[in-house]
Structures are given as structure tokens and as C-alpha cells.
From Swiss-Prot:
Biological-process GO terms, alphabetical: acute-phase response; negative regulation of bone mineralization; positive regulation of phagocytosis; regulation of inflammatory response
SS bonds (residue pairs): 32-355, 89-100, 114-132, 146-149, 208-219, 230-248
UniProt organism field: Ovis aries
Modified residues (Phosphoserine): 134-135, 138, 321, 325, 328, 330
Signal peptide: 1-15
Keywords: Disulfide bond, Glycoprotein, Phosphoprotein, Repeat, Secreted, Signal
Maturation and modification: Phosphorylated by FAM20C in the extracellular medium.
Record-level GO cellular component terms: blood microparticle; extracellular matrix
Ranges of residues in domain Cystatin fetuin-A-type: 27-133, 144-256
GO molecular function, a single term: cysteine-type endopeptidase inhibitor activity
Protein name per its UniProtKB record: Alpha-2-HS-glycoprotein
Cross-referenced InterPro entries: Cystatin_dom (IPR000010), Cystatin_Fetuin_A (IPR025760), Cystatin_sf (IPR046350), Kininogen_Fetuin_HRG (IPR050735), Prot_inh_fetuin_CS (IPR001363)
Annotated positions of the Phosphothreonine modification: 319
Length: 364
């Protein structure tokens, strides 16, 4: 009898290690820092960075909440809310995210907020749904930390556009290889001391030689795309003229990848998605002369949408507006229902809900 009681107690202890399913609400609530929860969140961040057409990569900062729903016939879906922070790596930069630095608060940091559904099936995580938005830290908070730190400037500001153009012209003048075109202006700030414009922008190589270019409009992007990322500064001299400094990092060329065509599509038919909507094509600089183009992930495709003209950063909502991804088309559709207003089930000891999770960097 004692042996039976001992076995019974051991069984109860083992069962306490698993997260109970709420028999009324129909979901589990693991801790936000649970390993599987974190893996689901990291899978979502990876998905976000792979589908961003412009701007900078984001990294996980905090998991705010999580519910795990069963999914028929197999698997389970993590319904997670996460906070992200912008890094200093551009989306075209092949540097692994783990090696990318988080942009600090004194540099006018940008935070993202995402609601995501991630399917876990056979030990693999795949993203079903992503809805995000992002915003820079408030000017007041930046000023509290650093009164003299520059704030983000509108990317279509005439001084910003001029700074990007002269910085790129300076780079091309110093370059003995390909002529580079502007892909996008990614970030800009007005620096008070010394009075200057700081600008960051992405570029792409063309089939022209930099030293021989007469008409840049006749230059075409290379079939095997080569991108670069530049940082420039333009200081207006008191007696006229400018001091221009620029440094560019060029990335390895990207091989041509055949794009799958829809059934029945003609070989020469134009794509429904403009080249400017995807990362492997040059887009015009965001200036007052032409409305910038963004994109929304809609299932297996990327759909072009207009961007706000006076934006200072690339808002995640312009890509992740809450459209289910292609993975959700397989198997039974998953719909998160409204959470019933019920008490917690009578689980011995009561479940411990450790949410929100730890902050990996800082809150803004």
C-alpha cells in the first residue's frame, strides 16, 4: 500500500510540471519565458525580418502574453504578444540577427509591438498570422536621457534628400567599380553640434562603371543584385560649401532566384507585385517628388501600398497589417476566439502565470 501511495505521489508531482489546459477557456497559459514560448517568439521575429522590404531588422525585447490553443488535427498554436526593438542592421544586410546591435535610446530608438500566431507541429514552428506596428521613442523621453541628442528627421525633408544624394555622389566619385544607385533613405537626423545632417541609406550596384557614367538613368541594376549600406554626414560651411563624409559597406552579390509563376501565367507577363515592393529591387528615394512604396505580406505574396509621405521611420504596420500567412492555408483554419470571463480551473496549487516576461534590453 505504501508503495502504491508513493507511486501515486510521484505521478502527481510529474503531472504538476506540465501546464494544464483550461477546460472552459480551451487554452493553456505557459510562462512568457517558457522555452517553447520563446522559440515561437523568435520564429516570429525571424519571419518579420525576412519579410521586411525596407528599414532595419528587429530583435525580440519582451514577451507580453501567451496563450496556447490546440489545433486539429495536430499541433498547437501560440497566440503571443511581443515587443521588439530596432537594430542597426538594415534588412538588406546579411549579418545574422544575433550579431546586430540594438539601437540605443540616445540614438532615438524604435519599438515594435506585434500580435502573432505561431503553429508548433512536429517540433517545428511556422508563422500563421502577424500584426505589427512600430514607433520611435517620444522626443520627451529622448531629451530626458540626452538633451543634446538629435531626433529622427522626416525622410522626405529636402535637406535629408540632398544629404543622401551628395553623399552617394561622393561615394561614386571615389569608387573605381560599379556605379551605385539609391535604393532608399532609411534614417536621418539633424545634428546640432556641429550643425549637420546625418543620413543612412541603402544602395545597389548597376551595370555602369562609376568613373564613366554620363547619364545615370541609363544604368540598370545587375542581374545578380549587390546591395550596400551607407552612412553619410553633410556639414554646411559658414562661408559656403559643404563638408561631405560617407562610408559604405557593400554586401556579397545575391544569386538570381527564379520566381514561381501562378498556374496559367504567361512567361512574359508582368508580375502583379511591383519591383519596388520587394527587397531585391531599387526603389526611389522617399522625396516629395514621388510617393514612396511599401508592401504588405498577404499570404504568399507581397502587395504594394503607399507610405506616409512625412514618415521618419519604416512602420512595421505597413508590411504586417494582420493578414494570415500562407502557412495557415494548410490544415484546419485556426481562429482565436474571445476569451470567456471565467475563473481559473481548480488545479492543485493553481497555475503560476509569469507574464509579461523579462526585458532583454530596455523599455521605451
Amino acid at each position: 500500500m505504501k508503495s502504491f501511495l508513493l507511486l501515486f505521489c510521484l505521478a502527481q508531482l510529474c503531472s504538476c510540471r506540465s501546464i494544464p489546459l483550461d477546460p472552459i477557456a480551451g487554452y493553456k497559459e505557459p510562462a512568457c519565458d517558457d522555452p517553447d514560448t520563446e522559440q515561437a517568439a523568435l520564429a516570429a521575429v525571424d519571419y518579420i525580418n525576412k519579410h521586411l522590404p525596407r528599414g532595419y531588422k528587429h530583435t525580440l525585447n519582451q514577451i507580453d502574453s501567451v496563450k496556447v490553443w490546440p489545433r486539429r488535427p495536430t499541433g498547437e498554436v501560440y497566440d503571443i504578444e511581443i515587443d521588439t526593438l530596432e537594430t542597426t542592421c538594415h534588412v538588406l544586410d546579411p549579418t545574422p540577427l544575433v550579431n546586430c546591435s540594438v539601437r540605443q535610446q540616445t540614438e532615438h530608438a524604435v519599438e515594435g509591438d506585434c500580435d502573432i500566431h505561431v503553429l508548433k507541429q512536429d517540433g517545428q514552428f511556422s508563422v500563421l498570422f502577424t500584426k505589427c506596428d512600430s514607433s520611435p521613442d517620444s522626443a520627451e523621453d529622448v531629451r530626458k536621457l540626452c538633451p543634446d541628442c538629435p531626433l529622427l528627421a522626416p525622410l522626405n525633408n529636402s535637406q535629408v534628400v540632398h544629404a543622401a544624394e551628395v553623399a552617394l555622389a561622393t561615394f561614386n566619385a571615389q569608387n573605381n567599380g560599379s556605379y551605385f544607385q539609391l535604393v532608399e533613405i532609411s534614417r536621418a537626423q539633424f545634428v546640432p553640434l556641429p550643425g549637420s545632417v546625418s543620413v543612412e541609406f541603402a544602395v545597389a550596384a548597376t551595370d555602369c562603371i562609376a568613373k564613366e557614367v554620363v547619364d545615370p538613368t541609363k544604368c540598370n541594376l545587375l542581374a545578380e543584385k549587390q546591395y550596400g549600406f551607407c552612412k553619410g554626414s553633410v556639414i554646411q560651411k559658414a562661408l559656403g560649401g559643404e563638408d561631405v563624409t560617407v562610408t559604405c559597406t557593400l554586401f556579397q552579390t545575391q544569386p538570381v532566384i527564379p520566381q514561381p509563376q501562378p498556374e496559367g501565367a504567361e512567361a512574359g507577363a508582368p508580375s502583379a507585385v511591383p519591383d519596388a515592393a520587394v527587397p531585391d529591387a531599387a526603389v526611389p528615394a522617399p522625396s516629395a517628388a514621388g510617393l514612396p512604396v511599401g508592401s504588405v505580406v498577404a499570404g504568399p505574396s507581397v502587395v504594394a501600398v503607399p507610405l506616409p509621405l512625412h514618415r521618419a521611420h519604416y512602420d512595421l504596420r505597413h508590411t504586417f497589417s494582420g493578414v494570415a500567412s500562407v502557412e495557415s492555408a494548410s490544415g484546419e483554419a485556426f481562429h482565436v476566439g474571445k476569451t470567456p470571463i471565467v475563473g481559473q480551473p481548480s488545479v492543485p496549487g493553481g497555475p503560476v502565470h509569469l507574464c509579461p516576461g523579462r526585458i532583454r534590453y530596455f523599455k521605451i
